[in-house]
Amino acid sequence: MKKHNILFVSTDDKINIDISKQLENIFGEFCNIDNLVYVNRINIELSSYELVVCSDNDIKEYIHNNIDKNIPIVIVHRTINIENINKIISIENDSDVMVIDAYKESADETAKIIRKLGLININLIPYYPGCDKSKCEIGIITGSRNSIPQNIKQIIDIGDKVIDINTVIEIFTKLNISIDK
């Protein structure tokens, strides 16, 4: 069986490694997966790829505007690993809790995911380097401990975010891969 070729592009080394591993675990049987960290521009020929998966809309726009308008692109959406929800539920109601990440977009995304769960009544405050919101004592992180403010006394690590099932289905669909074997 001929494998499909996928390129994953992100702006962050850690995200690139994490998502590439997840893509390999899910699609490795059907696809060859390459990855690339986007800094200021992409110097790669995309014609050998059937699909580009990227970490955000800025990368998608860059590819469509500067490289190839016709290549199919999927933006990867991530969610919290269901195994770690109990860590969030254990937070006392009405607590102020920082959602800490190295990037604003990722901190906002994690806070949004937690709110969508609707399981708890806490005040989530996205935090990333450069913002001035350091009054909380509880912080939620998704694996990385690089951006934790000094005033945080309790760290709740909910692990790396995982690829959302809707993204998985979209990739299978774009590549015309039947999910049932």
Model-derived features: positions:
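Ser/Thr/Gly-rich flexible loops in soluble cytosolic domains mediating phosphotransfer, phosphorylation
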Residues: K2-F27, V39-I42, N57-I113, K153-K181
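A structural micro-motif
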Residues: C31, E50, I71-P72, I120-I122, ...
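Short, polar loop motifs at secondary-structure junctions
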Residues: Y38-R41, S55-E61, K104, P126-G130, ...
